[in-house]
């Protein structure tokens, strides 16, 4: 209702709105919640396009038990996303600092999730750590090579040392966007400051 009142016809969700308020999930199952939210959005002519999943386990972890638990957690959200009518679900690739292991673990997890429901896009955002390196994340995508698995390039999230607000080292944002766009199913377009030549 609020989105429609602002003239917004498509919205995205974030899992933390529900996992951080467990009373919501205690009152109704994820399945019922998804159906209820879909009904509300349809009543106002608003499309549910994407949901961002956070804090559901480390999909790139080298601890196999931990990684498999993360996959199971994300499968629940795939079911939820599909019932909600979303086209796309965003995940994070965290849990490993070694590039070779991170790549291998990420490919395994994404392959399972992407094949779990071929009608839903599973995308990775450059969201800290090794995933904020465009070259590394693009390499993961090329190895997964599944149509409904891709990226969500975030123009302001290419910090490879620190956090965006206190970043010690940035990956080249233009290079990163160029590397990730061939695999993109959605984008998080951000712009802040430009120099006299029009560069961010």
Question: Which stretches of residues belong to each language-model region?
Answer:
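Acidic/histidine-rich catalytic cores of soluble enzymes
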Residues: 10-11, 107-200
């Amino acid at each position: 209702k609020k989105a429609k009142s602002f003239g917004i016809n498509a919205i995205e969700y974030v899992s933390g709105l529900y996992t951080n308020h467990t009373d919501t999930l205690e009152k109704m199952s994820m399945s019922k919640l998804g159906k209820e939210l879909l009904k509300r959005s349809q009543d106002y002519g608003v499309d549910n396009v994407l949901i961002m999943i956070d804090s559901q386990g480390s999909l790139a972890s080298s601890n196999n038990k931990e990684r498999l638990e993360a996959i199971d957690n994300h499968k629940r959200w795939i079911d939820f996303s599909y019932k909600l009518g979303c086209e796309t679900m965003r995940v994070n690739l965290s849990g490993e600092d070694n590039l070779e292991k991170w790549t291998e673990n990420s490919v395994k997890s994404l392959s399972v999730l992407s094949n779990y429901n071929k009608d839903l896009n599973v995308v990775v955002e450059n969201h800290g750590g090794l995933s904020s390196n465009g070259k590394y994340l693009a390499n993961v995508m090329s190895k997964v090579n599944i149509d409904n698995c891709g990226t969500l390039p975030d123009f302001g999230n290419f910090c490879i040392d620190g956090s965006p607000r206190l970043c010690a080292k940035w990956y080249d944002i233009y290079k990163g966007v160029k590397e990730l766009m061939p695999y993109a199913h959605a984008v998080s377009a951000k712009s802040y400051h430009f120099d006299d030549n029009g560069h961010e």
